[in-house]
A protein has these predicted regions:
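Outer-membrane beta-barrel "beta-signal"
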Residues: 348, 407-419
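Transmembrane beta-strand segments of Gram-negative outer membrane beta-barrel proteins
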Residues: 28-48, 72, 76, 359
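Outer membrane beta-barrel
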Residues: 66-184, 218, 222, 397
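Repeated loop/turn-to-beta-strand initiation elements of outer-membrane beta-barrel proteins
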Residues: 34, 71-76, 106-108, 160-163, ...
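Membrane-embedded beta-strand positions of outer-membrane beta-barrel proteins
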Residues: 38-40, 76, 110, 154, ...
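Residues that define the transmembrane beta-barrel architecture of outer-membrane proteins
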Residues: 53-59, 90-95, 104, 146-150, ...
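Transmembrane beta-strands of outer-membrane beta-barrel pores
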Residues: 42-48, 69-71, 80-84, 103-105, ...
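Detector for outer-membrane/organellar transmembrane beta-barrel domains
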Residues: 266-364
Length: 419
């Protein structure tokens, strides 16, 4: 039996086992505090331009297991994935595994978990704790892009206030696509020298001095929610360095300490919700232009902010617009990013057929380079368990982060079964 057949058999066996456990636990739901749920999804994308090759082809089983005992909850979630295009992504992945305990006015959560800060939608201003999986760039669900971290979180709260203290002992950075077979690779193509990705020794070591730490103070008041936050962290998106050696060039990621303090605010006004978010980044590092050569890296302070408005319109329409901008203080010409970098997002959706069909579009528009990424989606709920989706990812522009992928526009289809 081939390796592919072995993986397929294990995949099917795991799925059938989860269904059996789900059925057995469902029969004892009244007597048991165990909970099992999850989903199976399959996603396939084809480039809309020649050579019309596959951009993605993966099938996944997500399992989520919870156990409640008194004021505590144990939660574990995992993925088992078969990726036909990126063989290295095939296998088992522990997603979350944490212990959560809550008392009347305090609590804690210890373990591998997702940490979500701020009110921005698909844009990172103060949401800098959890890194991002950019293996397929932004052409996947944002919930799959955000990565969990090993964190210790302590909470103190009442009806109007919540204080969160956070420590992340182990470093995890962005997961970047560096495989030449990956159409979303961040490495340049058609280079004179062969590129070799080497991240050995790049990540911060497991030392007490390298711990990330911070806190967030949230207020829920009549007519307005807002928070203040601060974090001593690392740049999760690494700076890329190139060093030539003989007949090849070594490409390595570099990580540097940085920090921020900022906050967010959200205020409902009838059918509208106004949102804002801002951060002052300290010692943030940036990639340099190629002509900068081996110039020594240094940190810069930046001001990053976002304003947004959501309209929950009649007849199940929803429109969400955001404008964000980052300004680098004491700018120097070797920095590859513009002094003022701005991004506009627009999210429009409409539900039809008794809310079983949803048509939506989410667009990022790079105002500096006039590039864009627009995801059109049509999603139909066949029943309470099965959802079918088709869509088109449209990239455009000649420069910037979206222009890099202007030939990666794709047609995609997805099926999802929830259990």
């Amino acid at each position: 039996m081939t390796n592919t057949s072995n993986r397929s058999a294990k995949f099917l066996l795991l799925f059938l086992s989860l269904l059996s456990l789900h059925a057995a636990w469902g029969q004892e739901e009244g007597d048991s505090s165990w909970q099992l749920k999850g989903f199976v999804d399959t996603y396939h994308a084809v480039r809309s331009e020649k050579p019309n090759d596959f951009m993605s082809s993966r099938t996944r089983v997500r399992g989520e297991i919870g156990k409640s005992f008194g004021s505590s909850t144990l939660f574990v979630s995992f993925n088992t994935t078969h990726n036909a295009l990126l063989k290295g992504r095939t296998g088992f992945e522990l997603r979350e595994a944490y212990l959560d305990h809550r008392e009347e006015h305090w609590g804690f959560r210890l373990g591998r978990q997702l940490v979500i800060w701020g009110v921005a939608d698909g844009v990172r201003i103060i949401d800098l704790v959890s890194p991002m999986d950019m293996t397929e760039f932004l052409a996947q669900d944002y919930d799959d892009i955000r990565m969990p971290v090993n964190a210790l979180r302590f909470f103190v709260f009442n009806e109007k206030m919540k204080l969160e203290l956070l420590a992340v002992p182990t470093f995890e950075g962005y997961k970047l696509p560096t495989d030449a077979e990956n159409p979303w690779s961040v490495l340049p193509k058609n280079t004179a020298l062969h590129l070799v990705w080497n991240e050995d020794g790049s990540s911060p070591k497991l030392h007490f001095s390298n711990i990330e730490y911070g806190g967030r103070l949230c207020f829920t008041l009549p007519g307005v929610d807002f928070s203040l936050a601060a974090l001593h962290t690392w740049n999760k998106m690494p700076m890329i360095t190139y060093r030539s050696s003989g007949n090849h060039m070594t490409v390595s990621p570099q990580y540097y300490r940085m920090g921020f303090f900022g906050g967010d605010i959200s205020k409902p006004l009838g059918q509208f919700v106004l949102r804002g978010e801002a951060a002052f980044n300290v010692d943030k590092h940036f990639s340099y232009k190629p002509e900068a050569g081996a110039m020594e890296q240094k940190g810069f302070n930046t001001v990053n902010y976002l304003v947004g408005v959501d309209w929950y319109a009649p007849y199940e329409w929803m429109v969400m617009a955001q404008f964000s901008s980052e300004s680098i203080l004491r700018y120097e010409n070797q920095i590859a990013q513009p002094r003022h970098q701005s991004l506009l997002t627009l999210n429009v959706s409409k539900k039809l057929l008794d809310s079983t069909l949803q048509l939506s579009n989410f667009t990022y528009f790079d105002l500096n380079h006039e590039g864009w990424f627009s995801r059109f989606t049509s999603s139909y709920a066949l029943n309470d368990h099965i959802q079918l989706s088709v869509g088109y990812d449209w990239f455009g522009g000649n420069e910037g982060i979206f222009g890099r992928y202007k030939n990666n526009s794709e047609i995609w289809a997805k099926a999802k079964y929830n259990f």
